[in-house]
């Protein structure tokens, strides 16, 4: 199932809203969209987030042309505009971590 940009940002907004409502910390995983980067950069403090290496390494549609189904993952690899914004976040210390996304499946 493809997770759209709208799904990603609406879920991220919901997490932040719940954390603020209950005055709790939250760490948001697998950020992949420029909308999430922009939103989360305005909600630092109790909210931290990660970007995964694969989303900093390849971008769509090139990755699907070159790698086929090996590039399929969830959340999906997005286009270069999202890739560029993720790198902007890394270069400007906006994100808090780069997560391994380590999930071995047999």
Which residues does each predicted region cover?
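Histidine/acidic residue-rich metal-binding segments in metalloenzymes
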Residues: 1-98
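Active-site anion/phosphate-binding pocket segments in diverse small-molecule metabolic enzymes
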Residues: 100-106
């Amino acid at each position: 199932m493809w997770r759209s940009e709208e799904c990603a940002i609406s879920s991220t907004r919901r997490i932040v809203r719940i954390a603020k409502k209950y005055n709790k910390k939250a760490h948001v995983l697998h950020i992949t969209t420029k909308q999430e980067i922009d939103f989360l950069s305005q909600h630092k403090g109790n909210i931290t987030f990660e970007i995964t290496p694969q989303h900093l390494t390849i971008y769509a549609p090139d990755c699907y042309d070159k790698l086929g189904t090996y590039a399929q993952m969830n959340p999906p690899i997005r286009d270069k505009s999202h890739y560029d914004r993720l790198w902007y976040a890394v270069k400007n210390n906006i994100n808090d971590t780069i997560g391994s996304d380590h999930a071995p499946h047999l």
